[in-house]
């Protein structure tokens, strides 16, 4: 890790077809091994298929999906008293979108017997209507966050690691 400068956040340029940064981020998420043209073909095809089936513009489909499955909190593990707690921590919109894209693609990739375009389109349709694998993950996240809400005060503690005394002060070998 560099000690000098904090890495600057690079702006993502909007995609060609919908002129949207959200679609560009989704394409980047789908892309494997730098094959952007293939990822664009898959995403645009999936969005067009979802648009035809729902009769709603493709951008509205994607924004509706993100509204349905984007989490408001992230679960972070915290160890206290020998027990691991999963504590809900509020997150920014960009991180929320990133998690939603991950859920959407992981559930789409679990489907077998179809091409990627059809799998993503089907997952988009189901997430838009409020069911499907990605929506299930969202609901599970909400339930776990609700159950961990009692321990949410732990997020204000320093979780940077164990506290150790200075070893030079340990005269006589007391640990």
Curated annotation (Swiss-Prot):
CDD domains, per the entry: uS7_Bacteria
UniProt-listed InterPro entries: Ribosomal_uS7, Ribosomal_uS7_bac/org-type, Ribosomal_uS7_CS, Ribosomal_uS7_dom, Ribosomal_uS7_dom_sf
Keyword terms of this UniProt record: Ribonucleoprotein, Ribosomal protein, RNA-binding, rRNA-binding, tRNA-binding
SUPFAM superfamilies referenced in this protein's UniProt entry, alphabetically: Ribosomal protein S7
Gene Ontology molecular functions: rRNA binding; structural constituent of ribosome; tRNA binding
GO biological process, one term: translation
Residue spans crossing the bilayer: none
Source superkingdom: Bacteria
Pfam families hit by this protein: Ribosomal_S7 (PF00177)
PROSITE patterns in UniProt: RIBOSOMAL_S7 (PS00052)
Leader sequence segment: none
GO cellular component: small ribosomal subunit
Record Gene3D superfamilies: Ribosomal protein S7 domain (1.10.455.10)
Family: Belongs to the universal ribosomal protein uS7 family.
Function: One of the primary rRNA binding proteins, it binds directly to 16S rRNA where it nucleates assembly of the head domain of the 30S subunit. Is located at the subunit interface close to the decoding center, probably blocks exit of the E-site tRNA.
Subunit-level organization: Part of the 30S ribosomal subunit. Contacts proteins S9 and S11.
Name of protein: Small ribosomal subunit protein uS7
Organism: Neorickettsia sennetsu (strain ATCC VR-367 / Miyayama)
Gene: rpsG
């Amino acid at each position: 890790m560099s000690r000098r400068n904090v890495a600057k956040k690079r702006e993502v340029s909007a995609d060609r077809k919908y002129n949207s940064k959200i679609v560009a981020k989704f394409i980047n998420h789908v892309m494997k091994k730098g094959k952007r043209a293939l990822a664009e073909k898959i995403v645009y095809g999936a969005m067009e298929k979802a648009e035809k089936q729902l009769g709603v513009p493709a951008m509205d489909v994607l924004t509706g999906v993100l509204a349905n499955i984007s989490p408001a909190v992230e679960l972070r593990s915290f160890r206290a008293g020998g027990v691991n707690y999963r504590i809900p921590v509020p997150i920014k919109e960009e991180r929320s979108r990133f998690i939603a894209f991950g859920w959407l693609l992981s559930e789409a990739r679990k489907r077998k017997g179809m091409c990627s375009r059809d799998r993503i389109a089907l997952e988009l349709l189901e997430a838009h209507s409020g069911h499907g694998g990605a929506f299930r993950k969202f609901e599970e996240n909400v339930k776990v966050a609700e159950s961990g809400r009692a321990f949410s005060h732990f997020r204000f503690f320093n979780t940077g690691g164990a506290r150790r005394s200075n070893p030079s002060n340990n005269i006589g070998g007391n640990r």
